[in-house]
């Protein structure tokens, strides 16, 4: 603002100085009195052909030259020149503007980095991406899925067979082994110790066992009778 004011004042002073010089060069015209001058004594103007006509000067050349010795002209030139102090101040004022822009950009970048860090901390950790070598192919995936389905079907079939066997065991009654005990209506005694004969390698028949038992019973009766007599 100071530099602009100085230029404005210098331009005003230069214009005033030029107007002052132009006014000095213009001479005032003589004013003749009406009483002394009569129409008879009026001088006649010379003809136009006799008087040489001067060419009209352009408007740019009409400006009066400035004398270098005049102190006013020096003041005007000094006013037009820019002050070094003002120029330095203007340069200094421009420099911090660039620095302030850089500082603003750096602050924005720092804010973005801090926001990204906070967002990354809030998000749950994701597993690292597998490399191309570690990634299984589509065919391998299909084979693995088929094997899994087959295993599931096998387990289901096993469970079904086990359930069927359990249901059969529950419905069919257990077949007990034939007991060797004598029933109430049978006259034949129990077969306690079957002996295999070396000749036939077969079990003795029921009739043979009955004869043996009768003999033993007769012996027992005889012994009981002898004991009673005694």
From Swiss-Prot:
GO CC, any one term: membrane
Subcellular localization: Membrane
Keywords noted in UniProt: Membrane, Transmembrane, Transmembrane helix
Biased composition (Basic residues): 101-112
Topology relative to the membrane: Single-pass membrane protein
Bias (Basic and acidic residues) ranges: 60-83, 113-173, 211-230
Residue numbers spanned by region Disordered: 27-230
Membrane-spanning parts: 7-23
Predominant location: membrane
The keyword Transmembrane belongs to this UniProt entry's keyword annotation: yes
Keyword 4Fe-4S part of the UniProt annotation: no
Protein name, per record: Uncharacterized protein AH6.3
The species this protein was found in: Caenorhabditis elegans
Species lineage: Eukaryota, Metazoa, Ecdysozoa, Nematoda, Chromadorea
């Amino acid at each position: 603002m100071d530099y602009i004011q100085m230029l404005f004042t210098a331009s005003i002073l230069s214009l005033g100085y030029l107007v002052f010089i132009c006014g000095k060069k213009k001479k005032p015209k003589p004013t003749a009195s009406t009483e002394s001058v009569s129409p008879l004594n009026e001088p006649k103007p010379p003809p136009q052909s006799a008087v040489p006509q001067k060419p009209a000067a352009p408007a740019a050349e009409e400006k009066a030259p400035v004398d270098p010795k005049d102190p006013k002209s020096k003041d005007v030139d000094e006013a037009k020149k820019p002050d070094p102090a003002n120029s330095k101040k203007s340069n200094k004022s421009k420099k911090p503007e660039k620095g302030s822009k850089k500082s603003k950009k750096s602050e924005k970048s720092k804010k973005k980095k801090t926001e990204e860090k906070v967002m990354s901390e809030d998000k749950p950790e994701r597993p690292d991406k597998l490399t191309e070598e570690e990634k299984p192919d589509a065919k391998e995936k299909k084979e693995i899925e088929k094997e899994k389905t087959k295993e599931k079907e096998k387990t289901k079939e096993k469970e079904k067979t086990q359930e069927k066997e359990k249901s059969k065991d529950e419905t069919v009654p257990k077949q007990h082994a034939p007991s060797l005990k004598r029933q109430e209506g049978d006259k034949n005694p129990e077969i306690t110790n079957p002996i295999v004969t070396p000749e036939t390698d077969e079990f003795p028949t029921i009739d043979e066992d009955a004869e043996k038992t009768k003999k033993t019973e007769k012996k027992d009766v005889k012994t009981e009778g002898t004991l009673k007599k005694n």
